[in-house]
Amino acid sequence: MSAPAAPIPLESRASGPLSGTLRVPGDKSISHRALILGALSVGETRISGLLEGEDVLNTAQAMRALGAKVERHGDFAWTVHGVGVGGFAQPAATLDFGNSGTGCRLVMGAVAGCPITAVFDGDASLRSRPMRRILDPLELIGAKVTASAEGGKLPLTLQGASNPVPVVYRTPVASAQIKSAVLLAGLAAPGVTTVIEQEASRDHTELMLKHFGAEIVTTLEGTHGRRIALTGQPELHGAPVIVPADPSSAAFPLVAALIVDGSDLVLSDVMTNPLRTGLFATLREMGASIEEDDVRGDAGEPMVRLRVRASKLRGVEVPPERAPSMIDEYLVLAVAAAYAEGTTIMRGLHELRVKESDRLEATAAMLRVNGVKVEISDDDLIVEGRGHVPGGGLVATHMDHRIAMSALVMGLASDKPVKVDDTAFIATSFPDFVPLMCKAGADFA
């Protein structure tokens, strides 16, 4: 089990206008997948722009433990020499994923199709998160799981299938992690593995599988869903990957620029995959000035330059269908809603309850302690925006990086400073968040 980092408290104070050009870290979802698929490929994969946060570094270490050669060649430049589909070696030690649910669940899928046994573990936060909905389909494929805690929680032992079988699996919720775990396990199975989802989730795994040479076909399923069919036992080939800037990380300086008067900030190379841009669409509905140019792409993932200027925001209603495209951004959207005029209602946020913390309750608590009127009704979050935030509160982050960053953003325009009890976990996804924001003009102390 990972040892907890020493707490790093921080205070956020009202700042002057934010300006300049920032390049936020590489996308976390793409970084995990590039390492894993590089390890499952034959030959060399060159990755540029890899996120070097703790979550991704733990995935890199897991790939080494499973037999791939993973090397760093300078800032954000990495190579992976893979072992091929089904070629993972028996790890000599526990695979420790720290705080990373994404890395842990995706690697479970990749291991499930290999005739090896691996022990999975993480920190206290990850040990509290449910794994059963990932494990159920992996057991259908042929894996065997032994877990010491109820609900399949970590630590657990996963014995991969000696003869994995293809499945047709309908996901119980819109979850890219469930879908990806099934597809990664299905790589080693003969025949076609099919995943059916009622609501489309992030499609990074499908796009990257194609980039590495897999035969995968996606068709529409109903009104909002998709059917993904993967032909198993391909020979994947190493490929170059340019990791775009993470839209979930870009959300924090973006919202900061919207709420701090006079701000004019440019964010470069931000991924705009349509299944990741729900926040941008919502903020534009609220009146945000967000412009795009310099459109380009790599490995099927589009990226753009964003120019964001301070804006007067208004309350809106966010439909539940938008949740899969912005599930990690609701915390900082709630901050924007607090600075808006009028009521913002965010519907269908049940998935926030099973993240690094119960993010629904934690978001409401973050706002309340800083003088914002907020209500939870079932799985809906209702924020009464008054155009300003009183501030002055101490935010408990519950070891959650996104709560910490959202609270720090909130304090940049509040009447009184906002204190955060611990910012150490920001390193899991955005190691340079504080210096990068200070470079743009933020006041943290």
Curated annotation (Swiss-Prot):
Catalytic activity, as annotated: 3-phosphoshikimate + phosphoenolpyruvate = 5-O-(1-carboxyvinyl)-3-phosphoshikimate + phosphate
InterPro entries, alphabetized: Enolpyruvate_Tfrase_dom (IPR001986), Enolpyruvate_Tfrase_sf (IPR036968), EPSP_synthase (IPR006264), EPSP_synthase_CS (IPR023193), RNA3'P_cycl/enolpyr_Trfase_a/b (IPR013792)
One of the record's GO molecular function terms: 3-phosphoshikimate 1-carboxyvinyltransferase activity
Catalytic residues (UniProt): D328 (proton acceptor)
Chief place where the protein resides: cytoplasm
Alphabetical keyword list: Amino-acid biosynthesis, Aromatic amino acid biosynthesis, Cytoplasm, Transferase
Location within or outside the cell: Cytoplasm
EC number(s) from the headed UniProt entry: 2.5.1.19
Any one cellular-component term (Gene Ontology): cytoplasm
Pathway per the UniProt entry: Metabolic intermediate biosynthesis; chorismate biosynthesis; chorismate from D-erythrose 4-phosphate and phosphoenolpyruvate: step 6/7
One GO BP: chorismate biosynthetic process
Residues binding 3-phosphoshikimate, per UniProt: K28, S29, R33, S175, Q177, D328, K355
Binding site for phosphoenolpyruvate: K28, G101, R129, Q177, R359, R402
Function comment: Catalyzes the transfer of the enolpyruvyl moiety of phosphoenolpyruvate (PEP) to the 5-hydroxyl of shikimate-3-phosphate (S3P) to produce enolpyruvyl shikimate-3-phosphate and inorganic phosphate.
Family affiliation: Belongs to the EPSP synthase family.
Quaternary context: Monomer.
Name used for this protein in its record: 3-phosphoshikimate 1-carboxyvinyltransferase
